[in-house]
Design a protein with these regions (language model features):
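A cross-family "folded-core" feature that marks the main globular domain of proteins
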Residues: 1-347
């Protein structure tokens, strides 16, 4: 008798995604993005079924969206949250659903048009983006262009102060004029935030450093979060995080910024709790992370403490920081090992 054995590299994600993409829920979310002025009745018509049938599935999305702090109204097919949060949701939705099929383009706007915009961007910034960076940028560009036609995004004054302090924002304005991108001020500011938070500009020191120093000079919430981390690492591990290094500041600010734009685990299709998994599989590491969380909250100011509430997303980022600097090892109690001669002497 043949035995079916699951290997470690078994592509369970791809198989699950294949079936999920055939579901009503996936098609409904996709429909909501592509036809934002439609209602549930329109979706039922497209699916050649009754409203009551699709409503049974649609109402299951209420708790699904709730975990991302988004309110979903099934009959109206409306999402209520900040526009930055909603756009981030759709970015992760399409990014994760096409991760194994890079040739798939899920948006209305032509991919070739977006590619022309990116070529112009590279020319003005005098950089060459990687394939990964181009894909990230292309997804965000498509989403921002398509959604800005009917719903505007807002950027807070604190972040606008960073933009005002960064002279390289003028390059983004120059680029938008060159390609005739009809973004208002907030839309362009939001795109700037995306470019620096999602690694589009990563690897280009002149822009990274300028952005990091702008955050530092403006003493933003993200920069204070990095300062808070530095203090806690010093007190918990006697480790000095070099927050004078602009590249480090840039990267650490970036993951905090991403957590401000979207609440929860960005892997939308597997509702995994890395915290619970670690609690079960690596209890010692879990307890260190829990202590880190408590120390971060205890030392944070009110605004930073509020941002730390998105621990479900920040957990992995902070874990990677501790792992990168081998700080889990420094928390191990030393074990005395006696050599044979020492044992004899002790008798």
């Amino acid at each position: 008798m043949d035995v079916i054995k699951k290997e470690k590299d078994f592509p369970i994600y791809n198989i699950y995604l294949h079936f999920y993409k055939a579901s009503y829920n996936y098609h409904l979310i996709d429909f909501m993005y592509k036809y934002p002025r439609s209602v549930l009745k329109d979706f039922a018509k497209e699916q050649f079924t009754s409203v009551s049938t699709v409503f049974r599935y649609a109402k299951l999305l209420i708790p699904y969206f709730r975990r991302y702090h988004i309110t979903f109204h099934p009959f109206q097919l409306e999402l209520n949250a900040s526009e930055a949060n909603i756009r981030s949701f759709f970015y992760y939705f399409y990014w994760n659903s096409t991760r194994e099929s890079s040739d798939k383009w899920p948006f209305h706007i032509e991919q070739k048009e977006i590619e022309k915009y990116i070529v112009a961007f590279e020319g003005i910034y005098d950089i060459t983006l990687t394939i990964f960076q181009k894909r990230v940028f292309s997804f965000w560009l498509a989403i921002n262009i398509e959604r800005s036609s009917f719903r505007k995004v807002r950027v807070d004054n604190e972040y606008k102060s960073v933009i005002s302090d960064d002279p390289h924002f003028n390059l983004l304005k120059k680029w938008s004029k060159q390609i005739n991108l009809s973004f208002n001020s907030d839309e362009l500011c939001f795109l700037y935030r995306i470019i620096y938070s999602f690694g589009v500009i990563d690897g280009n020191a002149i822009y990274e450093n300028s952005h990091a120093y702008a955050h530092q000079r403006q003493n933003t919430c993200s920069y204070r979060a990095v300062e808070n981390l530095e203090k806690v690492l010093q007190s918990m591990f006697r480790f000095s995080l070099d927050i004078k290094d602009p590249e480090l500041i840039f990267n650490f600010i970036a993951f905090h910024e991403r957590s401000y734009l979207f609440y929860g685990n960005p892997d939308l299709f597997f509702n995994r709790s890395y915290i619970e998994e670690m609690k079960e599989e690596e209890p010692r590491t879990y307890h260190i992370m829990e202590k880190l969380k408590k120390e971060l909250q205890a030392n944070a100011d009110l605004d930073v403490s509020k941002k730390l509430e998105n621990w479900a997303q920040l957990f992995l980022d902070y874990y990677y920081v501790l792992d990168y600097y081998d700080l889990f090892l420094t928390n191990v109690k030393p074990i005395k090992i006696l050599m044979g001669a020492s044992i004899i002497l002790c008798k």
